[in-house]
A protein has these predicted regions:
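Glycoside hydrolase catalytic-domain context in secreted enzymes
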Residues: 1-673, 679-694, 701-703, 710-715
Length: 715
């Protein structure tokens, strides 16, 4: 449809019809204009799969039987693969399933930076590093939108905590904003070509992000040239005038008084009174019609989509296999050796995780690790289970109306206290004794511990990094009983591992890994799959070591000071040389890789490099070659190292391959707040290649001078 035809449609609309298109007329849809052939715009939550069907005017399920969908790995799990192909695959699955369910916009991916281990929505996000976020988000977005479904990248911007999320002021300096918190969104717009974007709940520099002039008008539309649709977070609009003037296109909320939304009757009244020009509404409607045209909603020629197909399940399994991170494997404990009896311990071995706030879905099925091990081992091995702990009794916010109630700013924190009764304490100790006895009686034991969606959950943050439900006591007892016990951690955020990290000989980490996650875990534990996942965040030794807690504020009060500036995650730990439990980018394999022959070449558009990687072991495996840049800091204080590239390469035993990479000049830049631009200062830069930020194998230096034709202002 030409732009002329779109404007012709707008001229035919009444004020009321325009208003109907720019705010929710149901919990997850706007109103169309039937007489002009304009349909409603249907949306759905979707980070881990298309959400179950809800009532039109409340959050209760419809109770239909045709809304079972595929359960995808969380964004944190996708990021653990460090593989752009897997991100693209998950985007394709999500886009196809959204179309199959009749949705136009899928509210994903979430790409906010992980600032603190305690944020309840970390599992929905990707990483503490903006480059990894950008590189994984772009193919995911493209995969979604190839299916005639619009991605809705969220939450723009600085939604880094759930505590007081509706009104908290994120106080961050411009350099940190530009270097850390915005690059993922910029990549989503410029490279991913996302068609829609969701504003955040929080405030930034005095204005709520859903109608923040600086973020939406100056940066998003002005600097980045975004020409898509901006959608509010549900209940994130607070001012009719700002919403009209500052770049918001669609207001959604959690309540059913649709005509009372800021961009409904109140906006219509302001237009009729002359306070707001109708041309502002026309621009919003134009953006929505352009979106509909791009999705082929107006011409009838559109992909139909599908859900719960075998192809989707196979793609999810492949992603889940690559998302598992081997943290420790002392003495080659893994893969598990053939035995007659295998002890499987821990509630997370048999727990299903397809949920967590707006990530909750209605999964067709979910394979737990216990199921996966039994499937893989068949009748040859007796797989014996002991729960070890139980999560009964914790406070839950997973209820039908939790989202509507979330606007009441409940002072709820995710923490575990237990019910404290004598009977409960007796039962807890019985579970530990039973688990320890089982571990002692079996040659092999795997203990599944970690979090669940009572702790990794929208609407609340954790109070600490400790494992809930008395798991630390369980771990100690099981390791006392069997020192060869493998610890398998399931969590969407870093957890405190100090009680077992030195004692356990083998530790495996997995985020919420989708409907095939349990099978993928079994395959890795048994050696059917060689693990190749890497951590997308740092696991610190103590919460107080984290920069958001030691330098900045978390969760703060009405305002949260990001005093740590650009020193977030490994940027802080590496610069301050602070020891961590497991560093950013860490992940082991069942084989060994060697690095050599690093060569760098200076060209007009950046530094080009090549490095030789060899599989020195006896099994095939995949290696993630990570490239970091560090400045000597002669003129500007910079983090010690920053991720600027990565390549995942699959190698057969004995195979050697040259891995190529490119570092554009912006990879060497920082944001100059005085000049309000990125620039490359004169300095000596280290190009570091290795397996993680803490395991650098090769280093070469690059000198960039002030008058160097290749230096100066970033390109």
């Amino acid at each position: 449809m030409t732009m002329q035809k779109i404007w012709d449609l707008i001229r035919e609309m009444t004020l009321e019809e325009k208003i109907g298109m720019i705010h929710g007329q149901g919990i997850f849809h706007t109103k169309g204009v039937e007489r002009l052939g304009i349909p409603p715009l249907w949306m759905s939550d979707g980070p881990m799969g298309v959400r179950k069907e809800l009532q039109d005017d409340n959050w209760a399920p419809k109770g239909t039987t045709d809304d079972y969908v595929s359960y995808l790995p969380s964004n944190t799990a996708i990021a653990c693969t460090w593989n752009r192909e897997r991100a693209a695959d998950m985007g394709c699955v999500l886009g196809q399933e959204a179309r199959g369910r009749g949705k136009d916009v899928i509210l994903a991916p979430g790409i906010n930076l992980i600032r603190s281990p305690l944020c309840g929505r970390n599992f929905e996000y990707m990483s503490e590093d903006p480059h990894l976020i950008s590189e994984m988000a772009v193919p995911l977005i493209r995969g979604i939108e190839e299916q005639d479904t619009a991605a809705c990248v969220k939450h723009f911007a600085l939604n880094n905590q759930e505590t007081r999320r509706l009104d908290v002021e994120a106080a961050v300096d411009e350099r940190a904003l530009r270097e850390l918190y915005l690059p993922g969104f910029e990549a989503a717009v410029k490279e991913g070509k996302t068609k829609t974007l969701m504003g955040a709940y929080n405030r930034f520099r005095g204005e709520h992000c859903c109608h923040n002039h600086y973020l939406l008008q100056d940066i998003l539309r002005g600097e980045w040239g975004f020409d898509g649709v901006v959608i509010s977070d549900w209940g994130g609009v607070h001012d009719t005038m700002q919403a009209a003037e500052n770049g918001l296109d669609i207001e959604m909320s959690v309540t059913s008084d649709f005509d009372q939304y800021c961009m409904a009757d109140p906006l219509a009244e302001r237009v009729r009174s002359g306070d707001i020009p109708e041309a502002l509404l026309d621009e919003k409607v134009k953006n929505i019609l352009v979106l509909m045209d791009r999705l082929h909603m107006l011409d009838g020629v559109r992909k139909r989509g599908s859900y719960n197909t075998r192809d989707h399940q196979e793609a999810i399994l492949k992603c889940a296999e690559e998302a598992i991170v081997l943290l420790k494997n002392e003495g080659g404990i893994l893969p598990l050796k053939p035995v007659k009896r295998l002890a499987v311990i821990g509630e997370n071995a048999g727990k299903m995780h397809s949920g967590g706030g707006s990530a909750a879905i209605k999964a067709l099925y979910e394979l737990t690790p216990l199921m996966g091990l039994k499937m893989e081992l068949g009748g040859a091995v007796s797989v014996e289970y002991a729960p070890g702990y139980q999560s009964d009794g914790e406070k839950s916010v997973e209820q039908e109306n939790w989202q509507a109630e979330s606007l009441e700013e409940r002072a709820y924190k995710a923490s575990y206290k237990g019910d404290g009764s004598d009977a409960a304490e007796k039962r807890r100790r019985e579970l530990i004794r039973e688990a320890a006895a089982l571990a002692e009686s079996c040659e092999n034991a795997v203990l599944f511990i970690g979090l669940n969606h009572e702790f990794d959950l929208e609407g609340c943050d954790r109070t600490d990094m400790k494992l809930p439900y008395g798991q630390e006591e369980l771990i100690s007892a099981v390791l006392d009983a069997n020192e060869n016990t493998v610890i398998a951690v399931t969590a969407g955020s870093p957890v405190d591992m100090e009680v077992f990290a030195d004692r356990a000989k083998a530790i495996v980490y997995s985020s919420y890994n989708g409907m095939e996650g349990g099978l993928a875990m079994a395959e890795v534990l048994l050696g059917r799959v060689n693990p190749s996942g890497r951590l997308p965040f740092t696991i610190p030794k103590r919460l107080e070591d984290c920069q958001a807690h030691s330098i900045g504020e978390f969760p703060g009060g009405d305002s949260v000071a990001y005093r740590e500036s650009v020193y977030v995650g490994y940027r802080y730990y590496e610069t301050e040389r602070k020891a961590v439990r497991y560093c950013f980018g860490h992940g082991l394999s069942y084989t060994e890789f060697s690095y050599g022959d690093l060569k760098l070449e200076r060209r007009e558009d950046g530094i080009y490099g090549t490095v030789t990687v060899r599989n020195c072991g006896s099994v095939a495996g995949a290696e993630v070659v990570e490239i970091y840049v560090g400045a000597a800091g002669k003129t500007v204080k910079r983090p010690a190292r920053e991720l600027k590239g990565f390549v995942k390469v699959h190698l057969q035993p004995g195979e050697e391959r040259a891995v190529d990479f490119r570092l554009p000049w912006k990879a060497f830049s920082y944001y100059n707040e005085e000049k309000m631009t990125f620039e490359v200062p004169e300095d000596e830069y280290s190009v570091c290649v290795g397996r993680s930020v803490g395991d650098v194998r090769l280093v070469q230096t690059v000198e960039i001078k002030e008058n160097d034709a290749l230096g100066g202002k970033s390109r």
